[in-house]
């Protein structure tokens, strides 16, 4: 790129949109080395403009780890991707250092710098008529394909318009907290709690599609803002390429292995399930789902592994912490869970389990018309305490009635 040699200290995401039937690169294997590597980078071609370097080690294709895959398997995955493909790559020198020091790459530290579309942080101060926009449930918006809250009907000259908010923006975070799996009323409440000013992390449709292709949450953009550039030499800005409309890749295999988003409303006897864990092993899972109870109606099943509680990943959290998160949720809780077979599949494929892989939640009836985010709000906001739960433990397991 401009004759300079770039060196990165972290993995990086590169987004390629095919032009003229080509991505502008080839794949190779190296004798005596594990993995697949990039080669034959076409000068000023799609791959080069996206930030791909010769001899880059290919770590992921569209969010799926391919470090142990054969050359033929990787080629097939790229072909199946169609016109758009997302690579997680490591440059030659960084790869060499990590191999020598036996350091494993962490995908959450990946640089987002080269991606052509980025989330936006929108800071607003409330005007006399509020912020000047409507918030509507995303499952109504055809084409989004995921749960979330969409910006609509921005008033001309309003704080929202002046701050750069756009119609159809998807809200990812409110005041630094992820709202990707929260329901409509919860997001509205978070905005109102901000008082006379609020900060929204939003994505347009192109950006949302791109991050979902990588199986990355746009919320990681906050983290990327706090990390160093990750390059010894400043990388030139990538040339934006328009998003091509193409047939979706064949996802038959993944369709059989989906996580589930379940929104539970607490009943008189709690949520109607037990939370279980095996001592000494990570993870908490669902047991004893009561037929006809809130958990059953929401789609929870015995042996479901809990991935997220209200948008927070809890896979590595201690059992007691997960119990506390659910109990402190009040009358409603949103869980991202995975059946045992699906969980084992994602673990084997090294695919991170994120909410964007799940089918979106149904839109609550009272949120279909959207509500104006304005200055008026209830003065009595006290929440009822969660009722007491029964907890049991044995020598090798934990079990709490929820």
Swiss-Prot record:
The keyword Repeat applies. Residues 12-93, 121-206, 261-341 form the PDZ domain. Coiled coil: none annotated. One of its GO terms (cellular component) is apical plasma membrane. Residues 240-250 have a biased composition (Polar residues). Disulfide bonds: none annotated. SUPFAM superfamilies: PDZ domain-like. PROSITE patterns: PDZ (PS50106). One of its GO terms (biological process) is protein localization to plasma membrane. It comes from the Eukaryota. Keywords: Repeat. Pfam families: PDZ (PF00595). One of its GO terms (molecular function) is protein-membrane adaptor activity. Belongs to the NHER family. This is Putative PDZ domain-containing protein PDZK1P1.
């Amino acid at each position: 790129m401009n004759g300079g040699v770039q060196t990165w200290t972290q993995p990086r995401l590169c987004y390629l949109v095919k032009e003229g039937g080509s991505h502008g690169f080839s794949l190779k294997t190296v004798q005596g080395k594990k993995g697949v590597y990039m080669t034959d980078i076409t000068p000023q071609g799609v791959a080069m403009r996206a930030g791909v370097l010769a001899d880059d080690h290919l770590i992921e294709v569209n969010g799926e780890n391919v470090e142990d895959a054969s050359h033929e398997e990787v080629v097939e995955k790229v072909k199946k991707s169609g016109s758009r493909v997302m690579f997680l790559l490591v440059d030659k020198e960084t790869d060499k250092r990590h191999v020598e020091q036996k350091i494993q790459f962490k995908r959450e530290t990946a640089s987002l710098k080269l991606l052509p579309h980025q989330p936006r942080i929108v800071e607003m101060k409330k005007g006399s008529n509020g912020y000047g926009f409507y918030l509507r449930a995303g499952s109504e918006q055809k084409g989004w394909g995921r749960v979330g809250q969409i910006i609509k009907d921005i008033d001309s000259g309003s704080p929202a318009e002046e701050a750069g908010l756009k119609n159809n923006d998807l809200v990812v975070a409110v005041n630094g907290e992820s709202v990707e799996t929260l329901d409509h009323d919860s997001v509205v409440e978070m905005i109102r709690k901000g008082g006379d000013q609020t900060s929204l992390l939003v994505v347009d449709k192109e950006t949302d599609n791109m991050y979902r292709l990588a199986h990355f949450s746009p919320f990681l953009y906050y983290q990327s803002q706090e990390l160093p550039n990750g390059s010894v030499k400043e990388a030139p800005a990538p040339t934006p390429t328009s998003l091509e409309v193409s047939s979706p890749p064949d996802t038959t295999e993944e369709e059989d292995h989906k996580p589930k988003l379940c929104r539970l409303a607490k009943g008189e006897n709690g949520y109607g399930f037990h939370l279980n864990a095996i001592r000494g092993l990570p993870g908490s899972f669902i047991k004893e789902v009561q037929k006809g109870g809130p958990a059953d109606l929401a789609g929870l099943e015995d042996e479901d592994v809990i991935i997220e509680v209200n948008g927070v990943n809890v896979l590595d959290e201690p059992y007691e912490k997960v119990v506390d998160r659910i109990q402190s949720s009040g009358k409603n809780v949103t869980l991202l869970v995975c059946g045992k077979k699906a969980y084992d599949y994602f673990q084997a494929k090294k695919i991170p389990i994120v909410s964007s892989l799940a089918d979106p939640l149904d839109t609550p009836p009272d949120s279909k018309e959207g509500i104006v985010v304005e200055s008026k709000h209830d003065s009595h906001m006290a929440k009822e305490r969660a009722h007491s739960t029964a907890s049991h433990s044995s020598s090798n397991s934990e079990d709490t009635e929820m």
